Amino acid sequence: MKYLFINSSKDKAGINIRNNLEKLNNINNNCIIDFFETPKKLTELSKKDLPQDYDYYIFLSKHRSVSEKPTLTVHTSGNLTTDNSHGGNIEEVCCCDAILNTILLVNINKYNNLEKYKKLGFDVSFEAIHHAPTDLDVPSVFVEIGSSEKEWAIDEAGEIMANAIIDTISSIESKSYKKLDKVIAFGGGHYAPRFTKLSLSNKCFVGYIIPKYAKISEKVLQQLIQMQDFDYILFDWKGINSEDKKRYIEFFDKNNILWKKVKDLCY
């Protein structure tokens, strides 16, 4: 497999992660790993800006939030609605690999819980789909250090992310991971606490996450089921508006797509 690590020269967190990746000498020799740095913001990129012929794009990025809570996050990019204020095309999502996203999250959490890193006080979570790029047709994922300029420059945070990325690639290349169902997740807030918990408990592989606040069209629903390999749809049942839930279920039933509730996995 061929992996491209992408960072912006304007992004301190991305540079931090890249510098730590370049220090590692335990990279799997059976795969090809390349680096690509752009002067653009990552949210300004599209397919035409990136080298082609890669199997995976891994974006090394900062995360910003109003709370400035120290957080390490994972998500696939895209615009679920007609709001493209953070770049990309409206109602368009990048290709997603639930196995890649979830193993990344699990490995980030593993390193974050080591004694040498616990003092940093980072949370670990998924994020819902958001921002550009939106037009990438190979699996793409953002790994982000947040949520303020202080955290972006913490070298140990870059170490956590770099080690997690390399461990993830090693697992994918060797297929040395537990086989779990792959899901597309609907409901809950932006940081998807229930889906984060399920993934960290090894209940399933979570790919796309569609939050409660995104009322997505049938056009986007079609993209989701075409752009990610999945076994079924997973609903955070109380984390979705009833009207949206009804509309989504009608679409999935019409297309003979299996769906389940989060509580079905909480055994």
Swiss-Prot record:
Organism annotation: Methanococcus aeolicus (strain ATCC BAA-1280 / DSM 17508 / OCM 812 / Nankai-3)
Family recorded in the similarity comment: Belongs to the DtdA deacylase family.
Positions of transmembrane segments: none
Cofactor entry: Zn(2+)
Biological process according to GO: D-amino acid catabolic process
GO molecular function list: D-aminoacyl-tRNA deacylase activity; zinc ion binding
Key word Coiled coil present: no
Protein name in UniProt: D-aminoacyl-tRNA deacylase
Known EC number: 3.1.1.96
Cited HAMAP family: Deacylase_DtdA
UniProt keyword annotations, A-Z: Hydrolase, Metal-binding, Zinc
Quaternary state and interactors: Monomer.
InterPro entries, A to Z: Deacylase_DtdA_archaea, DtdA
Cofactor note: Binds 2 Zn(2+) ions per subunit.
Recorded catalytic activity of this chain's protein: a D-aminoacyl-tRNA + H2O = a tRNA + a D-alpha-amino acid + H(+); glycyl-tRNA(Ala) + H2O = tRNA(Ala) + glycine + H(+)
Task of the protein: D-aminoacyl-tRNA deacylase with broad substrate specificity. By recycling D-aminoacyl-tRNA to D-amino acids and free tRNA molecules, this enzyme counteracts the toxicity associated with the formation of D-aminoacyl-tRNA entities in vivo.
